[in-house]
Amino acid sequence: GTPEFISDEANIAHDAKYTVFDGRKLGKWHYTAVNYIYLCGILSKLEHKSYEKLFRETYIKPLKLKQTEFLWSSMTKLKSAGWVPGYERSSGQFMRVDHDQAVKDAHNELGAGSIVMSNADLAKTIEYILHGKLLTKESRKVLFKGKAPSYYNGGFYNLKKYKVANGAGEGYYTFLRTTKGAKDMIIIQDNHTAHGEFGKIKKKVNRIMSIMLHFN
């Protein structure tokens, strides 16, 4: 994004200017937030609405989500939604992440890291996406079927027995595991993060999900 936030459109134009083609990566899977940023730009252009407006109309309003907000919303709205600041471990102690910097990063991660949401709201949204009327069965079959080695598509790592989604940044961790129809789900979020802990927690959550499904 631009050094100082101007608009979503300016950020997308800035990203496009600095996006280059690397032939060595052609045909190889690699996650990058810029794909979601471009998708947000395409949707906004097609619908003539901002990504925020589209998100509110698609999820927040119809699902009556009370604990979901954009990180750049007013502090009043954030606190009303139950928002808590993120902390990162540095030199042996947890330091609060600067909110202004977190907001700038949220703008730069449009569509990939802009939302703060409670476990309950996240579960409700995931159930709506995987089992509700938002998508047709045919659309879900296409969207949630990734290719090896990661099986990533539609925002999930689509494993054989369950789906995986993770998030990290600005002092937050999110780990989500769900069965295909969102009947069984694990959601763990934390606002205290430390270098090297993400991978360890991710493996433990995967293990818990496997055990849960084994006894289900």
Language model features with spans:
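Short, surface-exposed loop or secondary-structure junction motifs
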Residues: 1-162, 166-168
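Loop/turn elements at helix/coil->beta-strand transitions in domains of secreted/extracellular proteins
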Residues: 66-67, 181-184
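A short acidic/small-residue loop/turn micro-motif
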Residues: 106, 192-194
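Hydrophobic residues embedded in beta-strands of well-ordered beta-sheets
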Residues: 163-164, 183-185
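Short clusters of small/polar residues that mark proteolytic maturation junctions
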Residues: 168, 189-190
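Short, surface-exposed beta-strand/loop micro-motifs that present aromatic residues
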Residues: 172-181
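Structural recognition of the beta-strand scaffold that forms the well-ordered cores
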Residues: 177, 185-189
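Short, gly/Ser/Thr-rich active-site loops of penicillin-recognizing serine hydrolases
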Residues: 194-216
